[in-house]
Curated annotation (Swiss-Prot):
Keywords for this protein: Antiviral defense, Cytokine, Disulfide bond, Secreted, Signal
Residues making up the signal peptide according to the UniProt record: 1-23
Alphabetical list of Gene3D superfamilies matching this protein: 1.20.1250.10
Main location: secreted
Protein name per its UniProtKB record: Interferon alpha-C
GO MF, one example: cytokine activity
Task performed by this protein: Produced by macrophages, IFN-alpha have antiviral activities. Interferon stimulates the production of two enzymes: a protein kinase and an oligoadenylate synthetase.
Organism: Bos taurus (Bovine)
Cellular component aspect of the GO annotation: extracellular space
Length: 189
């Protein structure tokens, strides 16, 4: 009798967990990895921001893609994935390799790659639960356009040190916003 009762209790608890929450809980290590990425981005700074004031530009970061009361956790994971993926791609270009120390870039790319692995796992879990793609097309497009503007800016400025400094600072802000979004969902859980 005891085994049947414990089986039913276990089944009830598992069902409640699936119903009461989203299927994906990013590990606490993911939050630590976010902080590591921000630290590494900070260490990439080679040029004083004050010497690049004339190069500043408003790239119109799509803050609404990372905020708003209508953004669900599953959609937020998709946006986080999109920001992380584009950050990885940006710092995997030849231009970034000529600007910064390769070992520091490798550490950054490794940290971003781990983030992508965690987020992809969560995306698969959420898509299985919801049965549909999670990212609103307008959020995805806004993030892609933002990173496209950064790429065009670098090309326009011929990948100058100040252009990379401006882009690095922009990416830090974007990544910081995405980290804050993730932390707000973690506090709600």
């Amino acid at each position: 009798m005891a085994p049947a009762w414990s089986f039913r209790l276990a089944l009830l608890l598992l069902s409640c967990n699936a119903i009461c929450s989203l299927g994906c809980h990013l590990p606490h290590t993911h939050s630590l990895a976010n902080r590591r990425v921000l630290m590494l981005l900070g260490q990439l700074r080679r040029v004083s921001p004050s010497s690049c004031l004339q190069d500043r530009n408003d790239f119109a970061f799509p803050q609404e893609a990372l905020g708003g009361s209508q953004l669900q956790k599953a959609q937020a994971i998709s946006v986080l994935h999109e920001v992380t993926q584009h950050t990885f791609q940006l710092f995997s270009t030849e231009g970034s390799a000529t600007m910064w120390d390769e070992s520091l870039l490798d550490k950054l790319r490794d940290a971003l790659d781990q983030q992508l692995t965690d987020l992809q796992f969560c995306l698969r879990q959420e898509e299985e639960l919801q049965g549909a793609p999670l990212l609103k097309e307008d959020s995805s497009l806004a993030v892609r356009k933002y990173f496209h503007r950064l790429t065009l800016y670098l090309q326009e400025k011929r990948h100058s040190p100040c252009a990379w400094e401006v882009v690095r600072a922009q990416v830090m802000r974007a990544f910081s916003s995405s980290t804050n979004l993730q932390e707000s969902f973690r506090r709600k859980d």
